[in-house]
Amino acid sequence: MGQIITFFQEVPHIIEEVMNIVLITLSLLAILKGVYNVMTCGLIGLISFLLLCGKSCSLIYKDTYNFSSIELDLSHLNMTLPMSCSRNNSHHYVFFNGSGLEMTFTNDSLLNHKFCNLSDAHKKNLYDHALMGIVTTFHLSIPNFNQYEAMACDFNGGNISIQYNLSHNDRTDAMNHCGTVANGVLDAFYRFHWGRNITYIAQLPNGDGTGRWTFCYATSYKYLVIQNISWADHCQMSRPTPIGFASILSQRIRSIYISRRLMSTFTWSLSDSSGTENPGGYCLTRWMLFAADLKCFGNTAIAKCNLNHDEEFCDMLRLIDFNKQALKTFKSEVNHGLQLITKAINALINDQLIMKNHLRDLMGIPYCNYSKFWYLNDTRTGRVSLPKCWMISNGTYLNETHFSDEIEQEADNMITEMLRKEYQERQGKTPLGLVDLFIFSTSFYSITVFLHLIKIPTHRHIVGQGCPKPHRLNSRAICSCGAYKQPGLPTKWKR
């Protein structure tokens, strides 16, 4: 008690010293940040979730963000785009304005001859040109097609019947026939996202001196048969989705997407210079609902700290150390990635491509199904979390992000303010009680950082589906509001 009274008696003299002001400031910041970490580490969220799961859910998130939804009617796309679906691993369907094609993997041959008189069928106008356009696009996507005896076709009576011979049963066959038309058919089928019964084996150099590679595939079926059919409910258990050609096939863009995670309104975490979470990093990453800021500071602080300051002060200062060169590399990598994504999205839109899986990835937000998407609407500012590629600006479909120098300027200002020469001269005038307060606050802050690092889960997800917020699922994977009403689905905990 005497030390506390003495400490408060010396307060007027304490605040006269710059170093003491710094310690007081850092202590208050550490305490406030520690309290904030306790509030946001997930522990309170986990407790509230366990108390409310399965009982209530709200469309208001963080008091200001409203959950809204946009529903896309994909049925009208069938007027301009062919739709596709799969009944099982061997039967796939494409339909266009009431008529369709059936693509079947089978071991039974339909055509016994080995020729395809496409020119004669074209002169006699024997087939549906819209459906034949789909077949032609698929055929032209087959790499290195130079073995016409490997396919057969028949257009008698206006019926489309095309058969591709396949011969890849195991790994050895796939390697031996890697450059044949059969492998090309499997390659094209695989890139159409219909390859659940096709196995990727290996890749071999082309041997033409171009440095390109040929991908080898295997399947247990002997033939691929394409026939026109009258459309019926062939895919009752599968939602038909648009299929695309051209750029998505030639560029083989299959995994480029924009990813945004829904995080707390203001969540700070330790990371490395690229923004990746790293307990040993010297960067503070502030995550918001719509963006993430990287707050890092220069190596000069650490150099001067190691030369003239004690260990406690340095440990705190190292938390805000940053290498500017690493930030420049990070910015260039992000800009390169954005340019690549811009190219992919523009190619998709220019070719009238809206593929189900890619659309889901591009949204990067909670969703209920493939046609209804949820997004956040800020009731104060009007900002929404819909992807920028949906907003047309300057004739493009994706706004390019240009980084400013605010991070570097803020780093320099912080270093200049914290590392003044007067600190070295007046460091010895710091009272012991203030040092104890500083040590306590930094220890409290370190403990709360550990709570963040263990990543306490806060809610349940259904395995294989998106974030169910604001719905709170119970152990049976259901919510009382009726949005999730299929019990027994596997769940997992998420932060």
UniProtKB/Swiss-Prot annotation:
A GO CC term assigned to this protein in UniProt: membrane
Residues bearing a lipid moiety (N-myristoyl glycine): 2
Transmembrane segments: 18-33, 437-457
Alphabetically ordered keywords of this record: Disulfide bond, Fusion of virus membrane with host endosomal membrane, Fusion of virus membrane with host membrane, Glycoprotein, Host cell membrane, Host endoplasmic reticulum, Host Golgi apparatus, Host membrane, Host-virus interaction, Lipoprotein, Membrane, Metal-binding, Myristate, Transmembrane, Transmembrane helix, Viral attachment to host cell, Viral envelope protein, Viral penetration into host cytoplasm, Virion, Virus endocytosis by host, Virus entry into host cell, Zinc
Chain residues that bind Zn(2+) 1: 57, 471, 479, 481
Chain residues that bind Zn(2+) 2: 459, 461, 467
Site, Important for GP-C-mediated membrane fusion: residue positions: 33
Residues annotated as site: Cleavage: 58-59, 263-264
Example GO BP: fusion of virus membrane with host endosome membrane
Stretches assigned to the Cytoplasmic side: 34-58, 458-495
Disulphide bond pairs: 85-235, 116-153, 178-216, 283-296, 305-314, 368-389
Gene Ontology MF, one: metal ion binding
Family matches, as Gene3D superfamilies: 6.10.140.1590, Arenavirus glycoprotein, zinc binding domain
Signal peptide span: none
Domain of life of the organism encoding this protein: Viruses
Glycosylation sites: 78, 88, 107, 117, 165, 228, 369, 377, 394, 399
InterPro entries to which the protein is assigned, alphabetical: Arena_glycoprot (IPR001535), Arena_glycoprot_zinc-bd (IPR043015)
Family annotation (Pfam families): Arena_glycoprot
UniProt similarity note: Belongs to the arenaviridae GPC protein family.
UniProt name for this protein: Pre-glycoprotein polyprotein GP complex
Organism: Ippy mammarenavirus (isolate Rat/Central African Republic/Dak An B 188 d/1970) (IPPYV)
Gene transcribed to yield this protein: GPC
